[in-house]
Amino acid sequence: MANYFNTLNLRQQLAQLGKCRFMGRDEFADGASYLQGKKVVIVGCGAQGLNQGLNMRDSGLDISYALRKEAITEKRASWRKATENGFKVGTYEELIPQADLVVNLTPDKQHSDVVRTVQPLMKDGAALGYSHGFNIVEVGEQIRKDITVVMVAPKCPGTEVREEYKRGFGVPTLIAVHPENDPKGEGMAIAKAWAAATGGHRAGVLESSFVAEVKSDLMGEQTILCGMLQAGSLLCFDKLVEEGTDPAYAEKLIQFGWETITEALKQGGITLMMDRLSNPAKLRAYALSEQLKEIMAPLFQKHMDDIISGEFSSGMMADWANDDKKLLTWREETGKTAFETAPQYEGKIGEQEYFDKGVLMIAMVKAGVELAFETMVDSGIIEESAYYESLHELPLIANTIARKRLYEMNVVISDTAEYGNYLFSYACVPLLKPFMAELQPGDLGKAIPEGAVDNAQLRDVNEAIRSHAIEQVGKKLRGYMTDMKRIAVAG
């Protein structure tokens, strides 16, 4: 099979990369009705599989789970989760032939095997759904022409998809129809109904393409979302300890610092995150972020280039075929790093202390978010898509580090994201070592003392922060989510 993106001509590639439209609330007036009375069979019962299924059932849809025979006979975790939540469970052969919509929510590396197994069992005119388009775009999976292929991609982990639904809200979601597989022209109606059934329409839905979702998703997770957090954690910890900071305190400052810093990012973008600093610290964080952007820009561009060309995917799929040798080696090496093995700090660190003593970390977040966004947009991805795949998801990933350090992050994210994370962080750490050697007192681990600032310089820095394109689009999208939440709560 050939990489689907690489079979397109340049005009088609640009058109699919640039497909992004913010959908109006009125477009979801029918809710999930298009799928009511139809049989929806979910393959896979992991975090996305279970939680999307719970939401869809609560929205009035007929949901069941198709699992492999051995998962049922051996009563594996997927079988237990589905049955304990009262779902009908059966083998592929029992459930797939009756399905109107088969939703494939297994891990990326299992998609080809799953699709090749279910396709012959699917009835004529059925639909196949994904929540990530890797199998279609990068693997180039060929789907029978009578089958409609759609995607509904919540921009949050599965647990968050469920929690927001229970609160009467939802999570921002991308939807798409594969242009090669929409024989009856009903793909968009199916995708809209599925998105509404998960609650996504209450938080904002982008009409996208399989191509735009895959290329932007890979770029975000490799760079700012996972790779930058891993590289930053390792570099900052080593620097603090090298300068005499207690390893336990250094570990806590970093482990919980990312979450604290990015909570401000979530509420008010880079502007609010930077506003949490004193004026001298803000000027220093801005200067550091500009240096970091200059150093890291070629690395971000290389990752985007390799994603666009398919080089990244072919390398990762070669590792799949080699029993994940590289992935497992990198995972083991990460687990042995000084940051991961440092003792726990029993004392308390106040919220503002994370900002005051984490100026470099704030600079890393700002530089990484802006670089990821800029690199995606320069490659033809629309700003709204780039925002969701950079700034929006960062607090969610930072929260996983707060739970159990880098181990937890790498367990929670997909194997695809983990592989890309290691590629980036293994290149980024040595790249930034000379920069780390030149840091000044107050950049990390100590607060920058209050002092006089140049008003004109502060004015210009504030203007530069607030006028960045990610701040403009972010303000619009966060405002929409807030408005929608208000409506949902009132309703």
From Swiss-Prot:
One of its GO terms (biological process) is L-valine biosynthetic process. It comes from the Bacteria. Mg(2+) 1 binds at residues 217, 221. Signal peptide: none annotated. It catalyses: (2R)-2,3-dihydroxy-3-methylbutanoate + NADP(+) = (2S)-2-acetolactate + NADPH + H(+); (2R,3R)-2,3-dihydroxy-3-methylpentanoate + NADP(+) = (S)-2-ethyl-2-hydroxy-3-oxobutanoate + NADPH + H(+). Involved in the biosynthesis of branched-chain amino acids (BCAA). Catalyzes an alkyl-migration followed by a ketol-acid reduction of (S)-2-acetolactate (S2AL) to yield (R)-2,3-dihydroxy-isovalerate. In the isomerase reaction, S2AL is rearranged via a Mg-dependent methyl migration to produce 3-hydroxy-3-methyl-2-ketobutyrate (HMKB). In the reductase reaction, this 2-ketoacid undergoes a metal-dependent reduction by NADPH to yield (R)-2,3-dihydroxy-isovalerate. This is Ketol-acid reductoisomerase (NADP(+)).
